Amino acid sequence: MISKSSPLIFERSKKDRYAYSLPQNDIENISIASLLDDKYIRKHKAEFPEVSELDLVRHYTELSNKNFGVDTGFYPLGSCTMKYNPKINEKVARISGFSESHPLQEEEHVQGSLEIIYSLQEELKEITGMDEVTLQPAAGAHGEWTALMIFKAYHEKNGQSHRDEVIVPDSAHGTNPASASFAGFKSVTVKSNQRGEVDIEDLKRVVNDNTAAIMLTNPNTLGIFEQDIIEIGKIVHEAGGLLYYDGANLNAILDKVRPGDMGFDAVHLNLHKTFTGPHGGGGPGSGPVGVVEKLASYLPKPMVIKDNDRYKYDNDIPNSIGRVKPFYGNFGIYLRAYTYIRSMGANGLKEVSEAAVLNANYIKSRLKNHFEIPFNQYCKHEFVLSGTLQKQYGVRTLDMAKRLLDFGVHPPTIYFPLNVEEGMMIEPTETESKETLDYFIDAMIQIADETKNDPDKVLEAPHTTIIDRLDETTAARKPILKFEELKDEKYKEHTNIDSEDN
């Protein structure tokens, strides 16, 4: 959000002001009308802002100074693994042989790039315990959908097209039921037990002949390891279903236990989370999918294979669900992930998970006397606390999250998972120091104290940010999405905007 002191780029615009002039054209001008059908040609000039180079630079510099990311402060956003991204990743991604290549180049011209893709596939197979891996999916939810489409094709190939139900826990990521629906399945909820794990008896109740799969995160979204995972797999497999692993929480178990060893049939990973691709701002991400042998022939094509000492695309995948991403996915993220994996090595990845789990449990142990902790066992890489104690003073979890902004900390994930009242999900990752963790803990304790002794300070937060609280209801119901709308309504109250104009 831009403050009053930072006008929109359109508001900086002055007619005939420009940042750069092109040299005089020395070739014949050709009318665009002779090249394109009339329906593709603008009837009016695009209203681009006209600004000087200095104004342009200042505008984006001001905006960049208002950004918040893991490079500027602590970012304990639960279930998102907002870890530090090593800068060596960026150096490798900018090597000209990679950054200036084109996906339509001949295979013999991009052997280095294909080798990276192949090698990353092999690394991820080892990390996950899967038999084959595709890198094509563009992000986590895309990986979920890809795996579910593979499941669907597998069931149809085996005469089981009636299997149209996907089981998801009540603590699941919202993308799980959404991906299931998008893939043409119905979502069936399985309850959690008092330990925060899948309730085995309820699972037995919901599994039936229509079960296509169960989608699980392990550790789950509460940061708790599903101790009954082997039994869960047995129940679902005996019913003819498949096990899908949501890799959002893989950061907790690297080189400790693999999804394949737990009985999962498919897994998606988030290279932009666990493996330090830049995270946030809308992408690009990467959501590779790994599968066991019986599902390998359904993977998207092409795959990259090694043929003697050469690397090439392989389109000979008999039951493939087809291409799921133009070209071969987000290659720049592959470079960053591969650099990270090779830099860390197996022992380094194990230490990543150990430190992530240690950091989460340290915060949890220091906050347990100040907040309600729904599940008291040791957590993995993240945990969920509840703001119910503070709610009795009229303060909600949302208010405490806003107050954290005054401490220069990005708030944790709030009101998720849905089965924890006034939930706050905290994931510190492995890259934060004890000093940073202590600062966050002290801020949380201070806020807990303020809810009792000075609740207005929390209710009116944030106090130090460029803007305070947004009118989120009006923003959702009557959004102003274009500068023209803002210009038209400049002197009107936002709440008086006629929805028909939007």
Curated annotation (Swiss-Prot):
GO terms for molecular function: glycine binding; glycine dehydrogenase (decarboxylating) activity; pyridoxal phosphate binding. Keywords: Oxidoreductase, Pyridoxal phosphate. InterPro entries: Aminotrans_V_dom, GcvPB, GDC-P_C, GDC_P, PyrdxlP-dep_Trfase, PyrdxlP-dep_Trfase_major, PyrdxlP-dep_Trfase_small. The keyword Isomerase does not apply. It catalyses: N(6)-[(R)-lipoyl]-L-lysyl-[glycine-cleavage complex H protein] + glycine + H(+) = N(6)-[(R)-S(8)-aminomethyldihydrolipoyl]-L-lysyl-[glycine-cleavage complex H protein] + CO2. Its cofactor is pyridoxal 5'-phosphate. GO terms for cellular component: cytosol; glycine cleavage complex. The modification N6-(pyridoxal phosphate)lysine is found at K273. The keyword Oxidoreductase applies. It comes from the Bacteria. It is an enzyme of class 1 (oxidoreductase). GO terms for biological process: glycine decarboxylation via glycine cleavage system. Its EC number is 1.4.4.2. Belongs to the GcvP family. C-terminal subunit subfamily. The glycine cleavage system is composed of four proteins: P, T, L and H. In this organism, the P 'protein' is a heterodimer of two subunits. HAMAP family: GcvPB. The glycine cleavage system catalyzes the degradation of glycine. The P protein binds the alpha-amino group of glycine through its pyridoxal phosphate cofactor; CO(2) is released and the remaining methylamine moiety is then transferred to the lipoamide cofactor of the H protein. This is Probable glycine dehydrogenase (decarboxylating) subunit 2.
